[in-house]
């Protein structure tokens, strides 16, 4: 291999070219590569954060949905209990009213029965006096024998 001036000149030119590239071309290229690398890394980080945020939002939405369902179920259960309570209260009121009406009817029946017994006693007494008049053939004084009729009616 022959080393001559051309090879030395080419080596010097190449060295100057490399130094020139290292001084003026390489820093902007490195800077551009670093900026691009940073943008890509930031984009990936943003995508990861967005994915995590989406996952958290979905989890939170699911939790809120479960809570809403639980609240709805609780409200429905409370409504059912309240409805059952209202039905039971209505039944109790109906029973009380029925008992009151029944007691009132029994009292009226008892009163009518007593009135009928008193009327029957009076009629029996009048019939007894009428029968006694017919048997004795004479008129019995109603005022004089009222006590006798009352005793007879009380015995019947």
From Swiss-Prot:
Gene3D superfamilies: 6.10.250.1580. NCBIfam families: ATP_synt_b (TIGR01144), PRK05759.1-2 (NF004411), PRK05759.1-4 (NF004413). It comes from the Bacteria. It is found in: Cell inner membrane. F-type ATPases have 2 components, F(1) - the catalytic core - and F(0) - the membrane proton channel. F(1) has five subunits: alpha(3), beta(3), gamma(1), delta(1), epsilon(1). F(0) has three main subunits: a(1), b(2) and c(10-14). The alpha and beta chains form an alternating ring which encloses part of the gamma chain. F(1) is attached to F(0) by a central stalk formed by the gamma and epsilon chains, while a peripheral stalk is formed by the delta and b chains. PANTHER family: ATP SYNTHASE SUBUNIT B, ATP SYNTHASE SUBUNIT B', CHLOROPLASTIC. InterPro entries: ATP_synth_B-like_membr_sf, ATP_synth_b/b'su_bac/chlpt, ATP_synth_F0_bsu_bac, ATP_synthase_B_chain. It comes from Pseudomonas putida (strain GB-1). SUPFAM superfamilies: F1F0 ATP synthase subunit B, membrane domain. It is a single-pass membrane protein. The chain crosses the membrane at residues 12-32. Belongs to the ATPase B chain family. Keywords: ATP synthesis, Cell inner membrane, Cell membrane, CF(0), Hydrogen ion transport, Ion transport, Membrane, Transmembrane, Transmembrane helix, Transport. F(1)F(0) ATP synthase produces ATP from ADP in the presence of a proton or sodium gradient. F-type ATPases consist of two structural domains, F(1) containing the extramembraneous catalytic core and F(0) containing the membrane proton channel, linked together by a central stalk and a peripheral stalk. During catalysis, ATP synthesis in the catalytic domain of F(1) is coupled via a rotary mechanism of the central stalk subunits to proton translocation. One of its GO terms (cellular component) is proton-transporting ATP synthase complex. GO terms for molecular function: proton-transporting ATP synthase activity, rotational mechanism; proton-transporting ATPase activity, rotational mechanism. This is ATP synthase subunit b. Its main location: membrane. It holds the Pfam family ATP-synt_B. The gene is atpF.
């Amino acid at each position: 291999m022959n080393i001559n001036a051309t090879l030395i000149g080419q080596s010097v030119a190449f060295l100057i070219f490399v130094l020139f590239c290292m001084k003026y071309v390489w820093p902007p290229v490195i800077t551009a590569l670093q900026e691009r690398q940073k943008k890509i890394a930031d984009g990936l980080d943003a995508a990861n954060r967005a994915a995590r945020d989406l996952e958290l939002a979905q989890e939170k939405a699911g939790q809120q949905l479960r809570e809403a369902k639980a609240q709805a179920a609780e409200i429905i259960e409370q409504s059912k209990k309240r409805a059952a309570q209202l039905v039971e209260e209505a039944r109790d009121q109906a029973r009380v009213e029925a008992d009151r009406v029944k007691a009132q009817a029994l009292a009226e029946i008892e009163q009518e029965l007593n009135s009928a017994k008193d009327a029957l006693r009076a009629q029996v007494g009048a019939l007894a006096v009428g029968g006694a008049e017919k048997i004795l053939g004479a008129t019995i004084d109603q005022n004089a024998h009222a006590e006798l009729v009352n005793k007879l009616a009380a015995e019947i």
